[in-house]
Amino acid sequence: MRKKLIAVIAVAALSLPLFACSSGEKTELSKYTIDATLSADNILTATVTCDYVNNNDVPLKELWFHLYPNAYRDGAKYSPVAANRITDAYPSGKSYSVMKIDSVSVNGNAKDVTVSGEDENILVVPLGDTLDPTEKTSVKIEYSVKLPKVKHRFGYTDKSVNLGNFYPIACMYRDGAFVADPYYSTGDPFFSECADYSVTLTVPDKYECAATGEITGKTEAENAVTYEIGAQNVRDFAAVLGEYQKMSGLSGSTIVNYLYYSDSEPEKALNAAIDSVRIFGDKFGAYPYKEYTVVQTGFLQGGMEYPALSMISDAYSGDSKLDIIVHETAHQWWYGVVGNDEVKHSWLDEAMAEYSTMMFYEYAEGYKYTFDAKRADALAAYILYCETYKNNGRDDTSMTRAVNEYASETEYTYMIYVKGALMLDDVRNTVGTEKFMAGLKKYYADNKFGIAQPQDLMGAMEKASKRQLKPLFESWLNGNVQLYSNH
């Protein structure tokens, strides 16, 4: 997710009070079949069938599913929106979701389930029979949820409907337990494996649809339109609805779409997306999907990435908007194709996306920003922030913390986005551009559709450069690096 621009945050820092799938061998993927209907009053009724393949090395007696929409309910322990952004996110006043699980069955047999987790964020489904490694089971979940009116991943505004993280998705299983992180307001607190999706989405007929994957069918009926959508080997599925105009173009063989409702220069946004897919594909490895869609919507932050789909806030225009499009497109490689635990290792996709954005301006022509200027701005902003940070009695500049361990979105943004990009630039300067780029390509190829760990990136860079780089990475990650301005 793209936070507010670094230059804007640097100014804000001055006013702080004195105290932001499977890889390797081929394995069968799980599949989600979703049949959802959105009413005119923004109530979503859906049936999700998860044909779950146990790609873990241990047998399972139950499955856990994230219930992300529950985080928007009244009384939630954790709000998806930071306390200091509530007014911006809810301009019409606070609005809550209401989620109801109507029924759950496993292989056709009804099950008594439990909603648990730290914040009623987990659906626990007993399987009955043990599910051994490589075996498959089918879990059917019928539910309904009233969407909140909020400028966020899941919710609606006067101009659009965001369906991000709207369905029960299987929890990852790691180190002998299901990963059940709640919906923290800092960062993007998600972690999922790649799967196949077949989605039927029926919505009021005024809406056009932007979605992960390909829209393979569109059927109109009285006051409604039904979209058939397919996506293979993607880490998540999301959709955005609105009264959109659409432009499309090609980046190589990839169809690139831009959907918008308020843009005086839509061709610039489309071209930024096309250029990003082309440059990142050349520098990192080929974009693996047939289509990529950028969509304008009501959103609190600058943008939000989903596989083959990027939400871009309608609050931005001009060069700032183009910069956000580039950042979110970079996430198609770092998060979308190469996955990571976004709670524990958030720098692994955000720092990579931010530095990729800087590099974009090295190879693209006709844009306001340059690589050197972006790098200089990042260094100046980070040094200024750290000076203010120290004056406020804080000295932890480590990047190894989970997203909920940062004191604020501002601290998170500087440590993960800004410092993370500077770290990667230091690695590049240490090994040289040619070997650095070779390391990025190796990292992408080795971890495509899988879950990467920090050591995977370090290892790819070490193999490409034939140098020991772990101490360099760790000095940045652990907060030992000290940065100084040349001025």
Regions of interest found by a model, annotated:
Residues A12, A20-T45:
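N-terminal, polar/Ser/Thr-rich
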Residues T87-D102, V139-A238:
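Extended, low-hydrophobicity, Ser/Thr/Pro/Gly-biased non-transmembrane segments
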Residues D188-V326, Y355:
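Hydrophobic helix-coil surface modules that form long, contiguous segments used
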Residues E350, E354-L422, T430, N447, ...:
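Acidic/His/Gly-enriched intrinsically disordered linker/tail segments
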Residues K448-H487:
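Beta/coil-rich, acidic/histidine-enriched accessory regions frequently appended to metallopeptidases
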